Amino acid sequence: MKIQYLGLCSKKMKKYSYIFYYFLLLVSCENTDKQNTIDIDLSKTDSCIAYSMFVKSVENLDLHITDGLPITGVERLYFDESKIFVKDSGREGILVFDKGSGNLLKRVNPFGEGPEEIKRISSFCLDTYHKKICIFDQSDMKVKMYDFSGKYACSYPTDMFFIDMAKLDKNSMTYFYPIYAEEQFYGIWSSDSLNQLKKQVSSHVTKECMFHYFPMLYNMNDTCVYYYDRNWDEISVVTSDSIQTLYSLGVKQRIPLFKKGIRDITPQELDGYAILPNFDCSNNFILCSFHTFDKNDIRKKNITWVLLDTRTGKVTISKKLKNDLMAEDEIENNSLFYMNNYTWLRVDDSFEDLIRLKILHLQ
């Protein structure tokens, strides 16, 4: 868990008091003209959220790791038609696997000081238009491109810092920086390969937004992403030139805005407040995990799951996410990844010689 404090906040968060009448998730990138507010109280929990409430079936896919490759954990997962791209949470770079067999095809790990090498992978995404792996190397402020076989292709400099990026258009890149900054763009914008601004997509960032909790949160869905904005606890659809809010989450235990930018904030000041590490969207469901801070151990994993059935409006909250469709040991981590609107994934990376993907085929 990484927490970054980037300034002082002084304004209290806006409190939502709207009455929620119905739920409707419009998952099409072209049809997102409704906004709903969902009230969530993480203290009101049920015994469990069972897979059978939102999953049709579970399938295992083992990704086979070469002997001696010390994987720390899975930080990112991306897919194309035939390959799976895994970002290691340590220093092992990006691993490329065959989507059918799970065999390791390539390890993209060109760490070094040369112009074609990487000093630090600050973020990465796939360019499915040109079949490229895009890596932002913060150390020399360049976006470096590698083909799907791991061979260096090209790079371009950027004078704008960003937290994450997504390739949503053939001729531009979309960047995310949800932190207030006086000397550069903030919010969401798109630029071409010459670093020329094409569109300021969103500037919904105020001077109080000086706090960020890693990692960034979006579900990649072809020409759009489903984006979770932790400043306002909003789920939106973002394209290369537009943004539309789908839901606002009125989490009772959310961190007040005035606390988020306090430097050297103490565990006592965060005690009992919650923030969202992961979420997934689909045609019929949204699944979120919330981490609640403990004053006695700020790094303690204290996860509460929230499942929203967008067809009925039912919200289920529980400390336990249970696989009742398959007899197996429960996954110890709180991983949650998005493949598409019909498929989510959890990851068991506790094995030495493989990464086991739990493929959740949704209702």
Each PLM stretch: what is its role?
Residues 67, 109-116, 158-164, 203-209, ...:
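Short coil/turn segments at the loop-to-beta-strand junctions that recur within blades
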Residues 79-81, 126-130, 168-171, 220-222, ...:
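Residue-level detector of Asp-centered blade-edge/turn motifs that repeat once per structural unit
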Residues 65-68, 103-130:
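Blade-loop segments of beta-propeller domains
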Residues 30-32:
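Bacterial signal peptide processing site
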Residues 44-71:
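A short helix->beta-strand "capping" segment at the edge of beta-propeller domains
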Residues 250-265, 312-338:
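Conserved blade-ending motifs and adjacent loop-strand segments that build the rim/top face
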Residues 269-316:
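Loop/turn-rich, solvent-exposed surfaces of beta-rich toroidal or solenoidal domains
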Residues 73-76, 119-124, 160-168, 209-217, ...:
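Repeated scaffold domains used in trafficking and secretory/extracellular systems
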